[in-house]
Amino acid sequence: GWEHDLTYEYLRGPLTTLLGPIVEICAPLLMEDLIRKKGMFPSRVRRFCTQELKVKPMQRYLAGRQDAGEELINAVGIRAAESDSRSKMPEWEWQDGFDCEVWRPIISWSEQQVIDIHRRHGLAPNPLYLLGATRVGCWPCIHARKSEIRLIADKDPARIVRLRLLEDQVAVAAAARAERDGREFTRPAWFQNPVSRSVDGKRDGLCWPIEKVVEWSRTVRGG
């Protein structure tokens, strides 16, 4: 529920045509509903979005298939070059959380190899790549890069409006909690600690409203 509409259209159109029916797995609460219920945004410390919206729904789905007697392999399309953590992942390993083997068939591939296989099968890429996105997923992720924030602001300003509305709604819940607990109120924001401003290079705990983050995304490196 937090992907760009073009991604859903891509799944239900070109990919379904080439691969056959695709099962869409959904959590009981989508991203915005989950944030409103918790009265807070996901963060690097409390990354509940991944667990509640991806991991748990997948676990329930796989468990249902396994209970029906199926032997499963969880194939994941990630590449080692995408991050330091992914560079340490093997092609095959057992995942206790999903109770099955995970297979990463393109873990050692280059970006060009991914492009080539799309061309070989006559499959256009996700349209977001053609708009300038360097990766496709949550729109945006709490870990979005500066360039990704700028892209969203330029190509999908309505998303920025949705984020601002969500920040206003979460602020109401956060203010109530602060008053109840006798704490100083700090306005929550989607992007927490977007940049470091301290001398030692550590993040200073600031939460910037989405408009300020967008403004920062348009600055030069180091801005």
Regions found by a protein language model. Name each.
Residues 1-121:
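ATP-dependent adenylation/nucleotidyltransferase module used to activate substrates
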Residues 126, 131-223:
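ATP/NTP-dependent adenylation/nucleotidyl-transfer catalytic domains that generate, transfer
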